[in-house]
Structure formats: structure tokens, C-alpha cells
UniProtKB/Swiss-Prot annotation:
Chain location of the short sequence motif Nuclear localization signal per the record: 19-23
Record's subcellular location: Cytoplasm, Cytoskeleton; Nucleus matrix
Function according to Swiss-Prot or TrEMBL: Exhibits F-actin depolymerizing activity and regulates actin cytoskeleton dynamics. Required for cytokinesis in both mitotic and meiotic cells and for aster migration and separation. Promotes cell motility during ovary development and oogenesis. During larval development, required for the cell rearrangement needed for formation of terminal filaments which are stacks of somatic cells that are important for the initiation of ovarioles. Also required for border cell migration during oogenesis. During border cell migration, required for actin turnover and lamellipodial protrusion.
Family matches, as Pfam families: Cofilin_ADF
Mod. after translation: Phosphorylated in vitro by protein kinase LIMK1. Phosphorylation is required for inactivation of tsr and for cell proliferation and axon growth. Phosphorylation is negatively regulated by the panthothenate kinase fbl which catalyzes the first step in the conversion of panthothenic acid to coenzyme A. Dephosphorylated by protein phosphatase ssh which activates tsr.
Gene: tsr
One Gene Ontology cellular component: actin cytoskeleton
Keyword Cell cycle applies: yes
Protein name: Cofilin/actin-depolymerizing factor homolog
Source species: Drosophila melanogaster
Phenotype when the gene is knocked out: Late larval or pupal lethality with mutants showing defects in cytokinesis in both mitotic and meiotic cells, abnormal accumulation of F-actin in mature primary spermatocytes, and defective aster migration where the asters remain in close proximity to each other rather than separating from each other and migrating around the periphery of the nuclear envelope as in the wild type. Failure of terminal filament formation in the ovary at the third larval instar at 25 degrees Celsius but formation occurs at 18 degrees Celsius.
Length: 148
């Protein structure tokens, strides 16, 4: 079900700055006036994952957000002692259980529009609490797509 919410050009530009230019570590998006997905927060390249979790929850326990993060981790190929750095972009839909039903429905029905606008994201994650959004949970989901 489409919500009719559009994605602002600023979202697309900021995404390209993360994906191609490696200019930022992450961006938090929100739905403005129930009409358009827009940029709320942009973090510089040296920002940590903990800061991302703080920013995605910053508006309060009843608020939903989207977050795009350029995630880095070390990957070890099976049968070798060599490790290599991996980078994957993931897009998170943050809709806590404490959010009102109307807001959760708006964010979940608008997630598709954002996904279609941000081509090249490797993983989509839906989180309703911190256990689903933790660094460990996200890294596990990203590693599941690695080749052994």
C-alpha cells in the first residue's frame, strides 16, 4: 500500500554523498507534514554507530524514523587467516512499539518509496526496539549476505 509520500531531492543528494563520495557516515530521515520524506540529521564520516542509535531515537519514544548507515566491519574468508574491511549500506525503518498506530502505518507504507529512491542499498532492516537495532544484530544481518 503506497502512502503518497514523496522523497525530497535532498534525500537523494545526501544518499549519493554517502554512497559515492563517502562524505558522511549516516543520515536520519523523517516524514514532514505527512507528505514528504526529508533529511533530519547528517553525521560526519567519523561518527560512531552509538551516535546513530541516539539520533534515530532523538525525537522521543513515540516517533518513527528512517536511517541510512555506511557500516564497516572486518570479514574473514573461510579457510584463511586474512581479514578484509567490508562496507555495506543499510537502510533502517525505526518504528518503536510505543509509536502510535497511525504513525507506524505511515512510515511502513512509505518505506517502499524511500527504498526505490536510494538505489544500491545492500540491506533493509526493520527495527521496533534496540535489540533489533543494536550493532550486533545489524552486523549479523549484514554478515549473512557475505560469501564464505
Amino acid at each position: 500500500m503506497a502512502s503518497g509520500v514523496t522523497v525530497s531531492d535532498v534525500c537523494k543528494t545526501t544518499y549519493e554523498e554517502i554512497k559515492k563520495d563517502k562524505k558522511h557516515r549516516y543520515v536520519i530521515f523523517y516524514i514532514r507534514d505527512e507528505k514528504q520524506i526529508d533529511v533530519e540529521t547528517v553525521a560526519d564520516r567519523n561518527a560512531e554507530y552509538d551516535q546513530f542509535l541516539e539520533d534515530i531515537q532523538k525525537c522521543g519514544p513515540g516517533e518513527c524514523r528512517y536511517g541510512l548507515f555506511d557500516f564497516e566491519y572486518m570479514h574473514q574468508c573461510q579457510g584463511t587467516s586474512e581479514s578484509s574491511k567490508k562496507q555495506k549500506l543499510f537502510l533502517m525503518s525505526w518504528c518503536p512499539d510505543t509509536a502510535k498506530v497511525k504513525k507506524k502505518m505511515l512510515y511502513s507504507s512509505s518505506f517502499d518509496a524511500l527504498k526505490k529512491s536510494l538505489v544500491g542499498v545492500q540491506k533493509y532492516i526493520q527495527a521496533t526496539d534496540l535489540s533489533e537495532a543494536s550493532r550486533e544484530a545489524v552486523e549479523e544481518k549484514l554478515r549473512a549476505t557475505d560469501r564464505q
